Structures are given as C-alpha cells and as structure tokens.
Amino acid sequence: MALNTIDELIEDIRQGKMVILMDDEDRENEGDLIMAAECVRTEDINFMVKHARGLVCMPMTRERCERLGLPLMVQRNGSGFGTKFTVSIEAAEGVTTGISAADRARTVQAAAAKNAVAADIVSPGHIFPLMAQPGGTLARAGHTEAACDLARMAGFEPSGVICEVMNDDGSMARRPELEAFAAEHGIKIGTIADLIHYRLIHERTVERIAEQPLDSELGHFNLITYRDSVEGDVHLALTLGKVCAEEPTLVRVHNMDPLRDLLQVNQPGRWSLRAAMTKVAEAGSGVVLLLGHQIGGDDLLAHVREIASAPAPAPKATTTYSTVGAGSQILRDLGVRKMRLLSAPMRFNAISGFDLEVVEYLPAE
C-alpha cells in the first residue's frame, strides 16, 4: 500500500478528519490515530475507543500546559521514550461522569479553546494531556510532537488528540495491520519520518552561525557553531577531513558535560570527549558533535555528588530524545548521511527523516 504524502495528511487534518501516523520499527513501532483537538466531536472519540482501542491522549505545547496550570505527572520521567504525561484533566463544566465519548470530547474542546484558562478544567479526569517538546518533530520524533505539528500546519491551535491502534487480540497493530485498518476505514496514512523530512524542506530550528579552524593538542579540527532557535542552546561541531555523503562518516554525538569533559572524569562504558576526538584524529576524518545545554547550580551540585559517589556499573546507552532532533539537523547540514557511530547500540526514531542512517556502532574502548 502506497503511503500518503504529508500534504495529503495536512489537508485531511484541515478538514477535521483523522489520519494515521506510524513511527520507526525500532522504536515503539506503532501507529496512532491523530486529529486536531479543535475539531474533535463525540463520534471521533467513540471511533477511537471502539476501533483503535488505545489510550486517548491530548498532545499540546508547553505554553498551553502552563496556561492551563498542568504540571507533569512525575518530575523524574522513567518511561522508555520520555513521553511527558501531565496530570489528567476533565472539563470544569458540561460533563457528568467524564468517561463517556461526549464528556471526553467536551473536555478536549475546553482545553483546546484558543482562550482556554486553568479554570476551564479540573484534575484528575479522563483525558491525558501530553506535553510536546518545543520544536516539534524536529526536536523529538514522537506522536506527541507530530500531532501538534500537523494541527499547526493545518491552521489550528498546535494541539491534537491521539490514540494508539491495537489489533482485535489486544496486541499493537504494526504496519501491515495499520495499512489494512486505514484502507478499511478510508483514513490516510503516513510516517513521522516523512513529516520530519517535509518540515526540514520548509523550516529548521537550528542554524549555523560561525565557522573557524581549531588547533588542539588532539588534531587540527574545523569548529562550526550552531544555535537552536527554540531552546537557545549553542551546539558545536568539530569536523576533520572531508565528509562524504556516499561513505560512512565516523561520528560522536556528545552531550557536553562541564565536569566530565573539563576534569576528564572517566565513566565506564561511555566515550569521553578526549577519546572521541582522538579516535576521529586517528581515522583522519569524522565529526564530533557537542550538544550544549544550560545547567543550573542545583543540577551542577547534584552532578558533583553523583561523580563523587561509588562507581556504578557500566551504563547502557540511552537516547535523549529531546536532543536527537537538534543533533540530526546539524549532522545533515554537515553533509553526513551514513554514520559509524561512537556509541553502544541504541534506538532512534525516524532519523531516516533527516536522511541519516547508522551503519555501525562502535562501543567505547
């Protein structure tokens, strides 16, 4: 079955219809029904509950969550993909038990209204808001961000309603079942990767602001500076030699850490900045990408205590989904396409939307 284009999906969202969006097979490998929150009716919620069977959630921007006074459900997110659930909600007026399709639609309408305020909703309730990462799918390739992107691109408030599609036996529907579901119900279907690629053509959240040579004790690198227009963070790319799209590039994506990087504190199982730069210098070409993040005094103090504690077992590689988008945009700008990644194997979502592919993982030596 041929997938629909992003323009086709946007048009259906604009008409108040649902679409199906799939993510990567190496992530959740699921498909969600998605529609703009402003367009939700009772029959839409009923369709989701009856036919899709997943959890009905309401993605919205950080700004809307703050305006509605919605704190995160937990302060320390332990979920595998960093999905930011807030406390559940109910419309303050116009509902009875809150669980009926009509009541849930009313709750969505109350929270999605352009002039909605905290007094319009109460907690707990039967709708589960999700806080989207600023920058949308260019920052985090999840259904939460995709729903906000599609609603915004269709001319609505950047807020949606999503529901995972499940099979009759309760298992998650994968691509073959999702395509059959879409055909049966006349719903257009696409991928998050295609949405990312579409947005990259029309908009970006990271821009190159400076470039200069850098003579270090580990080699002669080229230093390129980028700024994230959403978060305001500054990221640095150290390149050596020629980057060729047709050939795999040696790449290290490194979250800047003032203690470990400057004091050269060893962390078992992870590439240090020095080791990564040395590896690239020995290879004669490659990219070391340094992702910068603002760190407060309390965070720094907690980090010092963590380093001072007893050595922990070698950590497993994990993905910080909020930084994958910025890093992917930068690598794409540098001309990287295929990567030999200095990292233990980890899962990414929809990096194919950035025209990137990991062909080999190189764990820390």
Swiss-Prot record:
Q: How is the cofactor bound?
A: Binds 2 divalent metal cations per subunit. Magnesium or manganese.
Name its pathway: Cofactor biosynthesis; riboflavin biosynthesis; 2-hydroxy-3-oxobutyl phosphate from D-ribulose 5-phosphate: step 1/1
Q: Name one GO cellular component term.
A: cytosol
Looking at the UniProt entry, the stretches that span the membrane are none
Keyword line: Lyase, Magnesium, Manganese, Metal-binding, Riboflavin biosynthesis
Q: Where does Mg(2+) 1 bind?
A: 28
Molecular function (Gene Ontology), one example: GTP cyclohydrolase II activity
UniProt-listed Pfam families? DHBP_synthase, GTP_cyclohydro2
Taxonomic superkingdom: Bacteria
**Which positions does UniProt annotate for D-ribulose 5-phosphate binding?**
27-28, 32, 140-144, 164
EC nos: 4.1.99.12
Where does the record place the region DHBP synthase?
1-201
Query: Any one Gene Ontology biological process term?
Result: riboflavin biosynthetic process
For the protein in the UniProt heading, the enzyme class is lyase
Q: Where is the signal peptide?
A: none
Site feature Essential for catalytic activity, where: 126, 164
- Name of this protein: 3,4-dihydroxy-2-butanone 4-phosphate synthase
Q: Which organism is it from?
A: Pseudomonas aeruginosa (strain ATCC 15692 / DSM 22644 / CIP 104116 / JCM 14847 / LMG 12228 / 1C / PRS 101 / PAO1)
